Regions:
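N-terminal secretory signal peptides that target proteins for export/translocation
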Residues: 1-2
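Bacterial N-terminal signal peptides
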Residues: 5-16
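N-terminal "domain-start" segment that seeds a small globular fold
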Residues: 18-42
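Conserved segment of the thioredoxin-like fold in thiol-based oxidoreductases
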Residues: 26-28, 64, 71-114, 119, ...
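Short pre-active-site segment immediately N-terminal to redox-active cysteine/selenocysteine motifs
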Residues: 48-50, 54-58, 124
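Hydrophobic beta-strand anchors of alpha/beta hydrolase catalytic cores
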Residues: 51-52, 83, 128
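Conserved redox-active cysteine motifs that mediate thiol-disulfide chemistry
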Residues: 54-71
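Thiol/disulfide oxidoreductase modules built on the thioredoxin-like
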Residues: 97-105, 112-157
Length: 162
């Protein structure tokens, strides 16, 4: 009984830590087409804190998270915060249609061949990577549950102060 309880406690601790982890190393560079048809490059944003959010319209947590990402963008964009939402679906038309109903003002990029999501080793939807001003990856989040946006805000504020 004690062994089973110990395994359960360890499992809960590991699971609670799995959704957010610190990272080190340079963020892989990429250039993708935005919904406006522009080419957007991560390298062009060096000097800003950048959130790269991988999402899909079929992902319910991704859709739940989107308004919170918009609020974060509105609050911190003028302070040097950028947000790139990378849609990973084969056909971007579904994402375009969904975005008509859920407007966001940050850049939405399309990765229909999943090349960028593979560079970032995306294993869950949504996955969110925070990149510091110097271009290094600092945090990664796998999945989304209500309340995660508070952790995003804490991490974005810390990176903006660096």
């Amino acid at each position: 009984m004690l062994r089973a309880f110990s395994v359960l406690v360890v499992g809960i601790l590991v699971a609670s830590l799995a959704w957010a982890a610190q990272l080190t190393g340079p963020a892989p560079g990429f250039t993708l087409t935005s919904r406006d048809g522009d080419q957007v490059s991560l390298a062009e944003l060096k000097g800003n804190v950048v959130m790269v959010n991988f999402w899909a319209t079929w992902c319910v947590p991704c859709r739940q998270e989107m308004p919170h990402l918009q609020a974060l963008y509105e609050r911190y964009n003028s302070l040097g915060f950028e947000l790139l939402a990378v849609n990973v679906e084969d056909d971007p038309e579904g994402a375009r249609a969904w975005l008509e109903e859920t407007p966001v003002t940050f850049p939405v990029l399309f990765d229909p061949k999943n090349e960028v999501s593979q560079l970032y080793k995306v294993v869950a939807m949504p996955s969110t990577v925070l990149v510091a001003r110097d271009g290094t990856m600092r945090f990664i989040h796998h999945g989304y549950k209500p309340g995660y946006e508070n952790e995003y805000q804490t991490q974005v504020r810390a990176l903006l102060r660096e």
